[in-house]
Amino acid sequence: MSFLFYGDSKHLRKRESFHFATIEKSDYSKQLQSLPLLPSSSSLRQDHIFSNVAKEVNQISDDVAIIYSRLQEEIDTEQSQTKEVNNKINHSVKKLESSFSKLVKLRSKFTKDSDKQLKQFESKYSDIDKKVRIIRDVNEELLDYVTRNGSIKVDATQFSKISKLLQERFPESSNTTETEANKDNSGQSQNEANSESLNSSYSRQSTNGSQNNAKKDYHSTKGNSADSNTTKSYRQSISSAPLALSSIRSTSRPSIATTLEHICITEPFTRPRGMSKSADL
């Protein structure tokens, strides 16, 4: 029992005691106390966790199934509508192709007809152009004849419209020709009276004829001088306003005269007795 009284390590009474600082009221103890309690091991098992979340998992699976069914319905509807639209488009394409083929056929037909009509028109136009050129040539020859001999040389009874047209186009020449015609009529009446009173002898008739020829030459020279003054107006009016024979109508079928040989133009007044046609020209 000696070890109880001595401070020997071998003796229990002789051992030293140690004193530790407590942390009961420190911040560390407060933080340890604020920690949550550890769950029990039964609550951490897999079957317990699955039983707690089974309702949510089932609800999610149901929602996914509903969404999938709705999407499938929409897809089916879109497919049916797309199929219907494709059928209508194919039908429209077939109709369009048939219409296009008909249009191509009609176009080829109309093109052939138009080409044929164009050729006919060109041939008719060439014929009309030739006839117009012939008529212009005849008009130019007629105007040359009128400007050389005057409008008095056109027979008013046979060519009333031509003489009227010439009087409208050339009033000055028509006035001069009227005065000349009056003078010719007065000379003609005098010649007829002289011829009736002097029918006794052939020599006196010949002398009267020569006098009448002299008077006619005098009037013709006077008319030619008047015509020479109006020749310029004739030529100027020809270029600006050519003679148009479209207003002249004939009851029979018209014939085209290429030269003046086929045109019968006579003098509008009676010729004095005993005068030849060569004396007038």
Curated annotation (Swiss-Prot):
It comes from the Eukaryota. Residues 67-92 form a coiled coil. Residues 172-213, 221-235 have a biased composition (Polar residues). Its main location: cytoplasm. GO terms for cellular component: cytoplasmic vesicle; vacuole. Keywords: Coiled coil, Cytoplasm, Cytoplasmic vesicle, Transport, Vacuole. Residues 170-235 are annotated as: Disordered. It is found in: Cytoplasmic vesicle; Vacuole; Cytoplasm. Component of the biogenesis of lysosome-related organelles complex-1 (BLOC-1) involved in endosomal cargo sorting. Belongs to the VAB2 family. Component of the biogenesis of lysosome-related organelles complex-1 (BLOC-1) composed of at least BLI1, BLS1, CNL1, KXD1, SNN1 and VAB2. This is Biogenesis of lysosome-related organelles complex 1 subunit VAB2. It comes from Kluyveromyces lactis (strain ATCC 8585 / CBS 2359 / DSM 70799 / NBRC 1267 / NRRL Y-1140 / WM37).
